[in-house]
Amino acid sequence: MKRINFSRAKQRALRAKRLHVKIRNLQLAANKPVLVITKTNAHIWAQLICYNKNITLASSSSVQLDLQNGNKDNARLVGVDIAKKALAQGFKQVIFNKNGAKYHGRIKALADAAREAGLEF
């Protein structure tokens, strides 16, 4: 069989697509919203998405909270804010999606703060 030589970018894109489909199917089966974390060097975002209805239920970010950057302390504030918004809408259990980022630093700080505020994932 002929070996296909993919570039790293193509491999990463294929892996991301597989993970997206896997998380989407997991959410559809569990009827739980997905907490999606997106980060850049400057800021961090968190969205609560329901794939059943294709809508965003709640969102929070370091930009929305008028924070200067997305460091660990501000990531904790975003985590607490998204947890409060999710609990206000009646969602206690969510599926955590870190968009392929490593679970450390700002991602971990946001996740821990959301757990402490009452979310389960």
Swiss-Prot record:
Superkingdom of this protein's organism: Bacteria
Single GO MF annotation: structural constituent of ribosome
Gene Ontology, cellular component aspect: cytosolic large ribosomal subunit
Xref: SUPFAM superfamilies: Translational machinery components
Keywords: Ribonucleoprotein, Ribosomal protein, RNA-binding, rRNA-binding
Primary role: This is one of the proteins that bind and probably mediate the attachment of the 5S RNA into the large ribosomal subunit, where it forms part of the central protuberance.
Subunit structure: Part of the 50S ribosomal subunit; part of the 5S rRNA/L5/L18/L25 subcomplex. Contacts the 5S and 23S rRNAs.
Membership in a protein family: Belongs to the universal ribosomal protein uL18 family.
This protein's name: Large ribosomal subunit protein uL18
Organism: Ureaplasma parvum serovar 3 (strain ATCC 700970)
